Amino acid sequence: MNFKYIVAVSFLIASGYARSVKNDEQSLSQREVLEEESLREIRGIGGALLSVGKSALKGLAKGFAEHFGKRTAEDHEVMKRLEAVIRDLDSLDHPEEASEREARGFNQEEIANLFTKKDKRILGPVLSLVGNALGGLIKKIG
């Protein structure tokens, strides 16, 4: 009889343990499902933020391109004015060489390659002031 009780109690303990393991597995799988769902939500939010960030960066890049494109055109005009001033000054100092320089002209690519982008940011306003001043002097002289 004691043996039957021992077997019955052992059976109850084993079945209780099996139920607790099964419940643990179910709760674990439920947690995993919840974690996966939350990760999907986080990824969705992250993807949305990433797409918004990309579009904002594209717009910002486009704006910078337009702004610096205009500035490059202004720099180009300043360089043209400076070339004209240099040609005029050369013609005053050396009249025989002025015609040769005008015939040859200045290569725009060579002049553009002399300045890096950093130099343009620093020298751009200075060159525009010098160009405007020299242009005004030439108009007064001419």
Curated annotation (Swiss-Prot):
Pfam families the UniProt entry points to: Bombinin
Chain positions found as Phenylalanine amide: 68
Residue stretches spanning the membrane: none
Assigned protein family: Belongs to the bombinin family.
Propeptide: 19-43, 72-121
Protein name: Maximins y/H16
Tissue specificity as recorded in UniProt: Expressed by the skin glands.
Modification Isoleucine amide, positions: 141
Listed GO biological process terms: defense response to bacterium; defense response to fungus; killing of cells of another organism
Keywords: Amidation, Amphibian defense peptide, Antibiotic, Antimicrobial, Cleavage on pair of basic residues, Cytolysis, Fungicide, Hemolysis, Secreted, Signal
GO CC terms in record: extracellular region
Domain of life from the UniProt record: Eukaryota
Signal peptide coordinates: 1-18
Reported function: Maximin-y shows antimicrobial activity against bacteria and against the fungus C.albicans. It has little hemolytic activity.
UniProt entry tagged with the keyword Transmembrane helix: no
Protein localization: Secreted
